[in-house]
C-alpha cells in the first residue's frame, strides 16, 4: 500500500506507517536516569478524534507501539511512557522517564488510524542514551586563617610581624667591643649572642 509523496512500511501487530520520503532522523542525546520530553505537532482537523501514538522502530520496516492516546486532554501512561494530546493546540506530548542505555534507538510519533492500522509519522527520532562524562575531582587546599603572633625579642633585637602569619625579624649584631675581660671570652660571648639573635 503506497501513495504519492510518502513511504509506507509495516510494523508490529500488522500496522503500517507512513512518513515523507527522505526524512532524516532527529538525534537527541540523554544520560541514564534523565527524562525525555518531546512535542509532536500536527494540523488539527474536524471530525472524530484521531489517536496519537509513540512507537519504537525494530527494523527498517517495523515498529512496536509503546503508548497510544485514547481521547484528548487525557494522559495515558504505559510503563515509563506517557502521551498527552492537545487537539485544539495542534500538538501532543511524549514523556519517557528514567531513561536507560537500552532505550537508545529510533522512535516515531504520529497520528494513529486504528481502523486501517496506519500511523502517519510526524517526527522520526534517534535517541542516544549514554553515560555522563566523568570529570576529575577538584582538590582544594584547606583555608588557613591568618594568625597573629606575639614576638618577644631579647634586648638588642626587634621583631616585625608581616601578613599571612609570617614574620620578618631584624636583629642587630651585639656590640662586641669592650675593654674588660679576656679577648677570647669576649669573642665566645659575642658568637653566642649572635647565634641566639639569628635563631629568634
Curated annotation (Swiss-Prot):
SUPFAM superfamilies, sorted: Immunoglobulin (SSF48726)
Subcellular location: Secreted
Keywords linked to the UniProt accession: Disulfide bond, Glycoprotein, Immunity, Immunoglobulin domain, Innate immunity, Secreted, Signal
Transmembrane residue ranges: none
Glycosylation sites per record: 93
GO BP term (any one): innate immune response
Residue ranges constituting the Ig-like V-type domain according to the UniProt record: 26-126
Protein role: Positively regulates Toll-like receptor TLR7 signaling in macrophages.
Cited PANTHER family: TREM-LIKE TRANSCRIPT 4 PROTEIN (PTHR16423:SF9), TREM-LIKE TRANSCRIPT PROTEIN (PTHR16423)
Protein name as catalogued: Trem-like transcript 4 protein
Organism encoding this protein: Homo sapiens (Human)
Gene name linked to the record: TREML4
Amino acid at each position: 500500500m503506497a501513495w504519492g509523496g510518502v513511504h509506507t512500511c509495516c510494523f508490529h501487530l500488522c500496522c503500517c506507517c507512513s512518513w515523507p520520503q527522505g526524512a532524516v532522523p532527529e538525534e537527541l542525546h540523554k544520560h541514564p536516569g534523565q527524562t525525555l520530553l518531546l512535542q509532536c505537532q500536527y494540523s488539527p482537523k474536524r471530525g472524530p478524534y484521531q489517536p496519537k501514538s509513540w512507537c519504537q522502530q525494530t527494523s527498517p520496516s517495523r515498529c512496536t507501539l509503546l503508548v497510544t492516546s485514547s481521547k484528548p486532554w487525557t494522559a495515558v501512561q504505559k510503563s515509563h511512557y506517557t502521551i498527552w494530546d492537545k487537539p485544539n493546540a495542534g500538538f501532543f506530548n511524549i514523556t519517557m522517564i528514567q531513561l536507560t542505555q537500552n532505550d537508545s534507538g529510533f522512535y516515531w510519533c504520529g497520528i494513529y488510524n486504528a481502523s486501517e492500522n496506519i500511523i502517519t509519522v510526524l517526527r522520526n527520532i534517534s535517541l542516544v542514551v549514554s553515560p555522563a562524562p566523568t570529570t576529575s575531582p577538584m582538590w582544594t587546599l584547606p583555608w588557613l586563617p591568618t594568625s597573629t603572633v606575639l614576638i618577644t625579642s631579647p634586648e638588642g633585637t626587634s621583631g616585625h610581624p608581616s601578613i599571612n602569619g609570617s614574620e620578618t625579624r631584624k636583629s642587630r649584631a651585639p656590640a662586641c667591643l669592650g675593654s674588660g675581660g679576656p679577648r677570647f671570652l669576649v669573642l665566645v660571648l659575642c658568637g653566642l649572642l649572635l647565634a641566639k639573635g639569628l635563631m629568634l
